[in-house]
């Protein structure tokens, strides 16, 4: 049986268990070889961090300390630390989008910080709902400070995000806030879908893509437009940048799904087979179940048996490895990798429909390339 996505044209990725040829996807663009993606990410982090720290300092104790721990600025005892603050993809995109509108990168900083606050609000709640005990190579907030603090600090970060934008007091800030709140609502919808899918035997590829578009694509789309909106861009430009960001988000999540099963824990900061431990209906799993064939059928049987178990505490590493191997044998790993490349291509093509400085376009291309080859 072959799994296909509709309306994707000649680049449609396929998986098969019957010996058919899997079409290749063009490699990630090399048009921006001169762009240093590490420098792009660091610029976004450098511009956003002072404003982010000042925002966190507004929080009442102990929420300020708990948030500082989450961002890696202090350790569990309150001592200064140099923790891993994440990849900083969203801040980088926000300041780049300001440049796309012809504004200085600094114009996008309030948007960069607002998006980063919403992103981390979602991580705090997500870790608690999923029972994740590790993030960025350290214990999660709920594990150290308790579930109540994780919930409260997450709520506070969401409030701060809107506060920072509205304090600008401009028409552009109002437009930016509307886009951010719309993206946040979509993110919450996606999280609700994700949780509900954990308790279903079957989820379609289309449902999975919709969920991941909401959960990851919406906020990345906002990051790609919010700086441009603050810089005075019209809705056509902002909407096009959002399209780039939405499909970049789907590519990003597809890679995350691969790392959630086959990623190196040293690089990801999470347990081996982390998504399998949480019964996630991620793209590799959904695609493998939809593929048909012996490996797909056996995987379905095992996952149905797993659903009857209250937890996976007694599962051996070998049992998780068996499930991962069946997903790969059924074609779920290969299909998801190709889907990441397909979404990457759609994102890049969106950039061709609007005007922006050539060096900024090259930055967007390079960052998209980074997303599909990253290891964490």
Language-model features, listed with the residues they occupy:
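Residue-level recognition of alpha-helical structural elements
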Residues: 33, 37, 41, 59, ...
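Divalent-cation-assisted or electrostatically stabilized phosphate/pyrophosphate-binding catalytic cores
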Residues: 82-83, 135-157, 201-216, 239-243, ...
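All-alpha helical catalytic cores of prenyl diphosphate-utilizing isoprenoid enzymes
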Residues: 53, 59, 81-87, 151-152, ...
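Alpha-helical phosphate/pyrophosphate-handling elements in metalloenzyme active cores
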Residues: 2-4, 65-114, 165-166, 205-248, ...
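Glycine-rich phosphate-binding loops that contact phosphosugars or nucleotide phosphates
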Residues: 127, 163-164
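Conserved N-terminal diphosphate/IPP-binding helix and adjacent helical/loop segment
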Residues: 1-114, 118, 124, 128-143, ...
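Short acidic/histidine-centered micro-motifs embedded in hydrophobic/aromatic stretches
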Residues: 66-70, 114, 131, 179-183, ...
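C-terminal helix-coil-helix/basic helical segment that borders enzyme active sites and/or dimer interfaces
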Residues: 99-102, 227-236, 259-266, 300-308, ...
